[in-house]
Structures are given as structure tokens and as C-alpha cells.
């Protein structure tokens, strides 16, 4: 099993020294991610590609899945490598591998060549294509938009047959740019903005301002862990949780209603700046988009920026909501965001869209800044890899079972795609399907005389959701784990 990884085009136009540095970092990132699949996978870097080889064919699907989610990869090819003797031998091997694909189809042959040979790339394409055309009567050559494209590469004395091409997510390798701190709320915007900075090469740490209790924190941790595990697990990152309820209480008590939204955001960036400074992070990332809500007008954004000297990045500033939701759907955070409550918008009934600096500063003079100092000082920092471990500790009161009682119902909370691809079949118990993102709104509609055993593939999501339901007052919930 061999994969040839092609670099994101912007990497290839860098100077020689920068290009080499980027390729080294990308190679290291790939090794870090693939190391979880075993130590038999080798990763070798070259000037214009990176080669991944494993002798274990059973890992092919897992390797493909991992490579499609590593920033810095434009696309990669799953290939077979052979030696060859001459042009006719190239045709014979190519036809043996792909001849059956062109029956009753239009096709073309595309060849790339590196090294010194007695033939050109065009000659290879014509010879191999002509051979296909002669040996398969139902096939027809079509150079533009054919049904089948036969791809092959010739490198010195090696023939490389391309079995499949997979698209990567592009961008720069994580670690080529400086670290950032994302203010994550669990909604559409903060998840997408975090992803966009990871894709641009920054290691993204997460800062969460808790306004809604432990249930809110559990939900946001799910999103942050998902983003890290899916796109950024080549690096260690921090998850910092700040209990912001005392700050909100002080704002509600002392700040004029119309100024509350801007003041709250200014307090958040002040706190985030201190957290960023503590960990040597260069910039803050937010999911703000121009004009989306009252605090996101140019006037208000400028006042929010004035509260700190730390750079604030807003990758979604010109995006509309529909586009943001589409990206969230593509990266897999839409289901989380759909049921995540928005707490910032509930504290002000008549927010100003054009705050005045003098008024904001006058209102902030009423604020007891020792409260802000205290919540930052007591902020909880954890390695994001420990979220799964912490979840296990948190839900010790939630029973885990592998056998069924008379009144039990197994609730498959995986996504519809996972349920369809790998149906849960159990004997002696009723199995119902309810995706995790619908639990908060539909669990209460279930028969409360039953005990529900939550099931997911790895157990982490079911534990988090069990704790979340317990927080809502549902005690008829356990976690099901297969024997």
C-alpha cells in the first residue's frame, strides 16, 4: 500500500528554504497522525511530494481517511509501483490493471514522467491509449471529459499506476504559522473560524467563556475535541474554561442595558488576551461577521478591539450565515451547533449598534474589575487530549452496562451516516435511533418508564450526552458498551 502526497500549491511557490521547512513540518504532522494506526507506516519526504508506505493493506481506508484531514495536503494518490522494460511493457501492465474499466466507456490516458527516457509523456499516452483502443472494441478515446481517465507516472525505471485520487483540505501545515487562541462557544461561527485558522497553518488553542453551567461546558468541549481530533491532532493544544457567570452578573447589575453586549465582548477579549499572554499565543480568533448581530457593526467591533493590544483575527468577517452553515456542514460541526444555546444574545434587550466610546468607558467605570481578575486567575486549563479521560471521571455516577434488563432500550446516538453504514444489531433488546444532536430536544418525548442505554462507537459521545441528560434531570439513562 503506497500513497503519494501532493503539496498544497502555495507551498510550492515559496522560497527554497521556506518550502523545505514547510515540507519537513508537514511530514512530521503526517507521522504524528498516522502513528496512532501503528508503527509499520513509513513517511518519506521529497522535494515535490511525500510518500506514505504500509505493508498492512487492512489499514488503507484508515490511512486515506486521516490524510484527507491533514492541512497542507492538496491531494494524494493511491498507487502501485512496478518495474518495466520498455514502452510495450508499460502498456501491458497498465492494461492488466485498468483494461476492464474502459469497457463501453470513453477514456483517455494521462502520463507524467520524471527522469531520462527514450520516449516522451505524449508518446506514452498515445501508445498506451492506442493499445487500449485496439484491445477493447467497445471503448472509445475521448480527450475531454472522458468517462474514465487512466493515470500513470514514470519515474526513472519505475512505473507508477494510479488506482485512486483523493482530495485533501489544502492549506498550510499546522505549525508553519504562529499559535492562536480561538474563543469558542460551540456555535456555527466559532467552530468554522477555528477550522479556518487550523487550515491556514496555526495551532489553535481554545478559550471557552462559560455562561450556561456545566451542561454548556460539556457541549463546547465536544465541539473543541471534535475539531482537534479531526483536523489538528498532530499537535497538543490547550482548552481553557473561564467561568464568566460572575462577570455577566456584574454587567447585569451595573451596566446600562443598551451597552451590555459591547461591554461583555470587551470583557471577553480582555480575559482572552491575558490567557493568550499566559501561553505565549500571538492572536485571538473570533467568529464575528460584519453586521450579523448588534455587537458586530464596524463601530462596535472597533470599540471591542480597543479593549486589548492583542491582535484579533476574524476569518468570517465577510461571510454570510448561509455560507458559514455550509462550511460547518462540510467539516462536521453543524450537528453540534444546531442545538448549542447562544447565551451572549440574551443579556441585552435593546443593544446599541453604534456604541460611543465615552459612554462605554463611563459604564465600565461602574464595573468591579477584581471580578474579571478573579475569573481569569481561576480559569481551568487542560490538555484537550484529556477531555475523553475527564469525561469518564465525570460520569462515574452514570452506570455503564453491557447486559440488558427487561425495561432497557438501547438508544443509538450516532449520526445517520454512521447508523446507515454500520447498523447496530442486538438480540433481546429494543434498539432505537436518535442522533446525539436531537437528544436535547427529543429525549423528553420518549417513554419515561423505560431506561435508555446510550450507544456510540467509541463511548465518548455517549458518556458526554449521558452527563448532559443527567444535568437536565433525566435519571433513566445509562451508557451501553459492547462486550
Swiss-Prot record:
Domain Rhodanese: 404-483
Disulfide bonds: 344-456
Gene3D superfamilies, per database record: 3.30.2130.30, HUPs, Rhodanese-like domain
One Gene Ontology CC term in the entry: cytosol
InterPro entries in the cross-refs: Rhodanese-like_dom, Rhodanese-like_dom_sf, Rossmann-like_a/b/a_fold, ThiI_AANH, ThiI_fer, ThiI_N, THII_Thiazole_biosynth_dom, THUMP_dom
Residues where ATP binds: 183-184, 265, 287, 296
GO molecular function, one term: tRNA-uracil-4 sulfurtransferase activity
Major location (coarse): cytoplasm
Keywords, alphabetical: ATP-binding, Cytoplasm, Disulfide bond, Nucleotide-binding, Redox-active center, RNA-binding, Thiamine biosynthesis, Transferase, tRNA-binding
Matches recorded under CDD domains: PPase_ThiI, RHOD, THUMP_ThiI
Localization of this protein: Cytoplasm
THUMP domain sequence ranges: 61-165
Biological or metabolic pathway of the protein: Cofactor biosynthesis; thiamine diphosphate biosynthesis
Annotated active site: 456 (cysteine persulfide intermediate)
Root EC class: transferase
Reaction equation(s) it catalyzes: [ThiI sulfur-carrier protein]-S-sulfanyl-L-cysteine + a uridine in tRNA + 2 reduced [2Fe-2S]-[ferredoxin] + ATP + H(+) = [ThiI sulfur-carrier protein]-L-cysteine + a 4-thiouridine in tRNA + 2 oxidized [2Fe-2S]-[ferredoxin] + AMP + diphosphate; [ThiS sulfur-carrier protein]-C-terminal Gly-Gly-AMP + S-sulfanyl-L-cysteinyl-[cysteine desulfurase] + AH2 = [ThiS sulfur-carrier protein]-C-terminal-Gly-aminoethanethioate + L-cysteinyl-[cysteine desulfurase] + A + AMP + 2 H(+)
EC number: 2.8.1.4
GO biological process, one term: thiamine biosynthetic process
Function per UniProt: Catalyzes the ATP-dependent transfer of a sulfur to tRNA to produce 4-thiouridine in position 8 of tRNAs, which functions as a near-UV photosensor. Also catalyzes the transfer of sulfur to the sulfur carrier protein ThiS, forming ThiS-thiocarboxylate. This is a step in the synthesis of thiazole, in the thiamine biosynthesis pathway. The sulfur is donated as persulfide by IscS.
Family affiliation: Belongs to the ThiI family.
Protein name: tRNA sulfurtransferase
Organism the protein comes from: Proteus mirabilis (strain HI4320)
Lineage: Bacteria, Pseudomonadati, Pseudomonadota, Gammaproteobacteria, Enterobacterales
Amino acid at each position: 500500500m503506497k500513497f503519494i502526497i501532493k503539496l498544497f500549491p502555495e507551498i510550492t511557490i515559496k522560497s527554497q528554504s521556506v518550502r523545505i521547512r514547510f515540507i519537513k513540518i508537514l511530514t512530521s504532522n503526517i507521522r504524528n497522525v498516522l502513528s496512532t494506526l501503528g508503527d509499520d507506516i513509513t513517511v518519506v519526504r521529497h522535494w515535490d511530494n511525500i510518500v506514505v508506505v504500509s505493508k498492512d493493506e487492512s489499514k488503507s481506508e484508515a490511512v486515506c481517511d486521516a490524510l484527507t484531514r491533514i492541512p497542507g495536503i492538496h491531494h494524494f494518490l493511491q498507487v502501485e509501483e512496478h518495474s518495466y522494460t520498455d514502452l510495450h511493457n508499460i502498456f501491458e501492465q497498465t492494461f492488466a490493471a485498468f483494461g476492464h474499466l474502459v469497457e463501453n466507456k470513453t477514456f483517455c490516458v494521462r502520463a507524467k514522467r520524471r527522469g531520462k527516457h527514450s520516449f516522451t509523456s505524449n508518446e506514452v499516452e498515445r501508445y498506451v491509449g492506442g493499445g487500449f483502443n485496439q484491445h477493447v472494441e467497445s471503448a472509445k478515446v475521448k480527450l475531454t471529459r472522458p468517462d474514465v481517465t487512466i493515470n500513470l507516472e514514470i519515474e526513472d525505471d519505475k512505473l507508477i499506476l494510479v488506482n485512486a485520487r483523493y482530495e485533501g483540505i489544502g492549506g498550510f501545515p499546522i505549525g508553519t504559522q504562529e499559535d492562536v487562541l480561538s474563543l469558542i462557544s460551540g456555535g456555527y461561527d466559532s467552530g468554522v473560524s477555528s477550522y479556518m485558522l487550523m487550515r491556514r497553518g496555526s495551532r489553535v488553542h481554545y478559550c471557552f467563556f462559560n455562561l450556561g453551567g456545566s451542561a454548556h461546558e460539556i457541549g463546547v468541549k465536544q465541539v473543541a475535541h471534535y475539531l482537534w481530533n479531526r483536523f489538528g491532532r498532530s499537535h497538543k493544544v490547550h482548552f481553557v474554561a473561564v467561568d464568566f457567570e460572575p462577570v455577566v452578573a456584574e454587567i447585569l447589575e451595573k451596566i446600562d442595558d443598551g451597552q451590555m453586549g459591547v461591554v461583555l465582548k470587551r470583557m471577553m477579549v480582555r480575559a482572552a488576551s491575558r490567557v493568550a499572554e499566559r501561553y505565549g499565543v500571538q492572536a485571538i480568533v473570533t467568529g464575528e461577521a460584519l453586521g450579523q448581530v448588534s455587537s458586530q457593526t464596524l463601530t462596535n467591533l472597533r470599540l471591542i478591539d480597543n479593549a486589548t493590544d492583542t491582535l484579533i483575527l476574524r476569518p468570517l468577517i465577510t461571510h454570510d450565515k448561509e455560507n458559514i452553515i455550509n462550511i460547518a456542514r462540510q467539516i462536521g460541526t453543524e450537528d453540534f451547533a444546531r442545538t448549542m444555546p447562544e447565551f451572549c444574545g440574551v443579556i441585552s434587550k435593546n443593544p446599541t449598534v453604534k456604541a460611543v466610546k465615552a459612554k462605554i468607558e463611563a459604564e465600565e467605570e461602574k464595573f468591579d474589575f477584581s471580578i474579571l481578575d478573579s475569573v481569569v486567575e481561576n480559569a481551568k486549563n487542560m490538555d484537550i487530549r484529556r477531555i475523553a479521560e475527564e469525561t469518564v471521571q465525570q460520569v462515574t455516577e452514570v452506570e455503564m452496562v453491557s447486559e440488558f434488563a427487561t425495561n432497557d432500550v438501547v438508544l443509538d446516538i450516532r449520526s445517520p451516516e454512521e447508523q446507515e453504514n454500520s447498523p447496530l444489531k442486538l438480540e433481546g433488546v429494543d434498539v432505537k435511533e436518535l442522533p446525539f444532536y436531537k437528544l436535547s430536544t427529543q429525549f423528553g418525548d420518549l417513554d419515561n418508564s423505560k431506561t435508555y442505554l446510550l450507544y456510540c462507537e467509541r463511548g465518548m459521545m455517549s458518556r458526554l450526552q449521558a452527563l448532559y441528560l443527567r444535568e437536565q434531570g433525566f435519571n433513566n439513562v445509562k451508557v451501553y458498551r459492547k462486550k
